[in-house]
Amino acid sequence: MAGTPNFDRRSFLRLAAAAGLTGMAGVTSATPGRSPGPKKDEILVGVTSTADSPRKAVADAVPGNAEIVHENETLSYAAVKFPSKAPKQARENFISAITKRDEVKYAEKNATHEALYTANDPKYGSQYAPQQVNADSAWDTTLGSSSVKIAVVDQGVKYDHPDLSSQFGSNKGRDFVDNDGDPYPDLLSDEYHGTHVAGIAAGTTDNNEGIGGISNSTLLSGRALSESGSGSTSDIADAIEWAADQGADVINLSLGGGGYSSTMKNAVSYATQQGSLVVAAAGNDGRQSVSYPAAYSECVAVSALDPDETLASYSNYGSEIDLAAPGTNVLSCWTTSTEYNEISGTSMATPVVSGVAGLALAVHNLSPADLRNHLKNTAVDIGLSSTKQGSGRVDAANAVTTDPGDGGGGGGGGSKETTYDGTLSSSSDSNCVSHSWNYSSPSQVVIDLSGPSSADFDLYATEGSGTCPTTRSYDYRSWSYDSTEQIVIDNPDTSADLGILVDSYSGSGSYTVTITEKE
């Protein structure tokens, strides 16, 4: 965010490397009959904000046997579909040709995603996740607030479940798989993941029914995965954009894996700019590699713990991890007659963090960046390395009872802001800034870029080397479809000046870089 957006405390799934909506702001209609679920024959083309529209920007480059089947004007991309029998080289040739255009920022395959995995509630005694994060102590202060919205981008949610029905308002959500206004699961026997996730985050607590969720927040369901547990990058990105536009304070992404996607990056960047905290699962491969989208700097990356607070054997880990939470054998809502079930995964740890975020927002009015910092500052060190626990195990009681101005356990809570103004005269023009640190050991630095809406400026940073980044050599990068960018660095290396590059991908004009160091 270039500057904190105005707001009023509004209120995993595995990615395979294979890689519509109507009547919503910024999204034009998809081609009628576009198949739901995986879209392996599609290429997503991202364009600059200066293009008339994504469709117009790429139309004359589309081969005769292909067609534009979808566009999202807010995220500035179009989906181009090739015949299923078209040779792989045809798609590769298209990507090579289209990315040479000045108005095109990227072209990538439309990836396929697959699902991974003292209150009076009768089953509360069979739970351990709320107790492990001290939710019961937090509930002495607040059970949560209906003014806080948590969006679950996942499979559909069984919103008439007895532990979920009161958490949904008149707007239940939207189905991005079938392209309609009802996010209810198509096949209850197979489509349980979203319901389980929703129950962990915000199943109704203290209602003499079933389990206790972490926070009594309002739920929104963005159905972007079908009953088969798979979905496309475009459907998930559109659902993230929609959730942000609906005023979601927290967007839960119990999905991820695979590689970097510019379309998904733009979606989580947009959501953050709109005032949403995006919480994502680290991945279930049991290796040192945090999956996307959790690895994006905008997302809170969550690893999974066993009941004894050791890292779960399946949980991914790495330097991008922000927080850890219980994820093994977590009891929550189910879609069949049993109504409740235990499953494991970073998918289950993620909504624990989302629920704690909901509790914190019921008490504290925080921006996404400040909420993220607050959750990390109030986390409990459980003795794991930072690559496994991040700042620690999320703690609901600390998040609710600690004044954000106190900085929790992570410093004095103060901050210092420095601004740098500049002008870029044309495309490919760039300026470098060398920033001297105000604090010797800040807990976090946030770099915001605000530039002209008619241009497309990108932001790069290096730490610990004292060198200026380039568009090819950098430690951090934020590049979306406009000139509003943000980089967040936790516990930055202050042994040398911070290097910052502002680069014009297209257009010209004045900009401001704001650097906020937090104690």
Swiss-Prot record:
Where would one find the signal peptide in this protein? 1-27
Which molecular-function annotation in GO is an example for this chain?
serine-type endopeptidase activity
Family matches, as Gene3D superfamilies: 2.60.120.380, Peptidase S8/S53 domain (3.40.50.200)
- Domain of life of the organism encoding this protein: Archaea
Q: What class of enzyme is it?
A: hydrolase
Residues in domain Peptidase S8? Answer: 127-400
Q: What is its EC number?
A: 3.4.21.-
Q: Where is this region: Disordered?
A: 386-425
Presence of the UniProt keyword Disulfide bond in the record: no
> What InterPro entries does UniProt report for this protein, alphabetically?
Peptidase_C_arc/bac (IPR007280), Peptidase_S8/S53_dom (IPR000209), Peptidase_S8/S53_dom_sf (IPR036852), Peptidase_S8_His-AS (IPR022398), Peptidase_S8_Ser-AS (IPR023828), Peptidase_S8_subtilisin-like (IPR050131), Peptidase_S8_subtilisin-rel (IPR015500), TAT_signal (IPR006311)
- The UniProt record lists the keyword Secreted: yes
Location in or out of the cell: Secreted
Propeptide intervals in chain numbering: 28-116
PTM summary: Predicted to be exported by the Tat system. The position of the signal peptide cleavage has not been experimentally proven.
Keyword annotations for this protein, in alphabetical order, are: Hydrolase, Protease, Secreted, Serine protease, Signal, Zymogen
**Predominant cellular place of this UniProt entry's protein:** secreted
Task: Mark out the compositionally biased spans (Gly residues).
Answer: 405-415
The cross-references to PANTHER family, in alphabetical order and at most eight, read: CEREVISIN-RELATED, PEPTIDASE S8
Q: What does this protein do?
A: Probable secreted halophilic serine protease showing proteolytic activity toward the protease general substrate azocasein.
By sequence similarity, the record places it as follows: Belongs to the peptidase S8 family.
What name does this protein carry? Halolysin
**Gene (UniProt):** hly
